[in-house]
């Protein structure tokens, strides 16, 4: 195994206590992004979302970067959604609309970064984490990977239209509707079978080594050709979006009694009682 791979593997497995919640690690032409809240299964804070945008902007300015790899620290999760405790402060329509607008900005920035992006997924990849992975160009998984948006049984909120469109184009309407309504998580083999990931490897160490290898391969390809292909695919996806906003869907869910119940139930580790109101 190459030294650069071992270096990355050791950092991802056991980051130092004083490391930031999002680690930006440059190794040659490859920019690594490590979501670093392993005790919280790498659930995203507002700071982590902001740092992800900043790293993407830095990559856009640095022509020596040729590929990005995103993964989660600790080996237990890629990203288990947004940190739910942050939702307790939601009280107004603006809170709900701003949250989804912020999420759209993060995913758009990642989706449009000029270099190819690889999500290296081990463990749960749910909610906001599933959105991040869907915004990447390529995905690899270990055998422990699980993917989905289980909000119909956990929080009672909804996705933005942009995220619904990403899921629709990646999985097709039938499977997208299936995982959204049943709130189930796909395992690694189903992710491979439906094309969500291109490879499944045995464990986290193999996953990180393969991600580095794939990123190095992409780094040898024509940057403008890859950028044009990425942008063309994004524009095709954008044509699926209907006219008009999705604020009615967002407000109906986020301002509901059910959403407040979902947040409190999740944090209390109990089953929510849905009323449809």
PLM-predicted stretches and their roles:
Residues 1-71, 108:
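Conserved CoA-thioester-binding segment of acyl-CoA-metabolizing enzymes
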Residues 12, 64, 72-108, 153-156:
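Glycine- (often His-adjacent) and acidic-residue-rich active-site loop
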Residues 38, 140-145, 197-244, 257, ...:
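C-terminal long alpha-helix characteristic of the crotonase
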Residues 75-79, 125-127, 233:
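Short, active-site-adjacent cap segments at secondary-structure transitions
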Residues 106, 110, 120, 126-179, ...:
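CoA-thioester-processing core
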Residues 138, 178, 182-184, 190, ...:
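Well-ordered beta-strand positions
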């Amino acid at each position: 195994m190459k030294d650069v791979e071992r270096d990355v593997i050791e950092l991802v497995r056991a980051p130092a206590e004083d490391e930031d919640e999002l680690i930006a690690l440059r190794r040659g032409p490859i920019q690594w992004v490590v979501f670093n809240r392993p005790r919280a299964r790498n659930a995203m804070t507002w700071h982590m979302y902001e740092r992800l945008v900043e790293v993407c902007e830095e990559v856009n300015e640095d022509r020596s970067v040729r590929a990005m790899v995103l993964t989660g620290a600790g080996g237990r999760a890629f990203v288990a959604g947004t940190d739910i405790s942050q939702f307790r402060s939601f009280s107004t329509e603006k809170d709900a609309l701003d949250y989804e607008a912020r999420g759209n900005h993060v995913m758009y920035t990642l989706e449009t970064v000029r270099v190819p992006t690889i999500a290296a997924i081990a463990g749960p990849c749910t909610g906001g984490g599933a959105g991040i992975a869907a915004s990447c160009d390529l995905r690899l998984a270990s055998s422990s990977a699980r993917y989905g948006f289980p909000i119909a049984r956990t929080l009672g909120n909804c996705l933005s239209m942009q995220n619904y469109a990403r899921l629709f184009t990646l999985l097709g309407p039938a499977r997208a509707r299936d995982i959204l309504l049943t709130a189930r998580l796909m395992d690694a083999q189903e992710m491979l079978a439906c094309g969500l990931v291109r490879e499944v490897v045995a464990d986290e160490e193999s996953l990180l080594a393969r991600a580095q290898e794939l990123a190095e391969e992409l780094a040898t390809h024509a940057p403008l050709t890859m950028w044009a292909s990425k942008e063309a695919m994004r524009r095709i996806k954008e044509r699926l979006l209907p006219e008009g906003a999705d604020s009615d869907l967002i407000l109906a869910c986020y301002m509901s009694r059910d959403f407040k119940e979902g947040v409190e139930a999740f944090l209390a580790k109990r089953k929510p009682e849905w009323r449809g109101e």
